[in-house]
């Protein structure tokens, strides 16, 4: 065993070790990162935690904290990935949202690669159309989520995806059409005669 008490440490009920924002334990010269500190226990986040710990240990003043929004990926078939808020999470907070969905089987690249199943879902704030969450299930979902992750960090709105010119044919275009879908849903809820943007006009 590790004999943690000999180092002045103790594991919690789930075998994890408590750390502060710098991943420093109660023993100042001992740091912990990764699975041993608990959720989310992912490779990507573990590496970021280790960088933060190293920077603090050597007083480098560079990367002082882990990014507030993290991506989560499950490498199943099909892949699943997300970043930001979920519909259930927002509902529990009493925060309204508009969801927009684009399916792989209606996307040119999705058709080319034979991805009959899969979708990208984007969550927006109804009033400002600020992006709140991104969810993907399907081929390359763990890659696809990164576009949304960057947009979340930038505090982007639907305008970013509408105004961006995506390569054609690519799965990246799903962002534009999921946004069109969200705008259409919002227009319908507001009783507007038509959505402010027409996806068909893009073709």
Question: Can you say where each PLM-predicted feature lies in the sequence?
Answer:
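Small-molecule pocket liners
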Residues: 7, 71-72, 120
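Hydrophobic pocket-lining residues within nucleotide cofactor-binding pockets
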Residues: 36, 70, 104
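A short alpha-helix-loop-beta-strand transition element characteristic
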Residues: 10-12, 60-71, 95-100
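Flexible, glycine-rich terminal cap/loop adjacent to redox cofactors
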Residues: 58, 75-203
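Rossmann-like dinucleotide-binding cores of NAD(P)H-dependent redox enzymes
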Residues: 40-47, 55-89
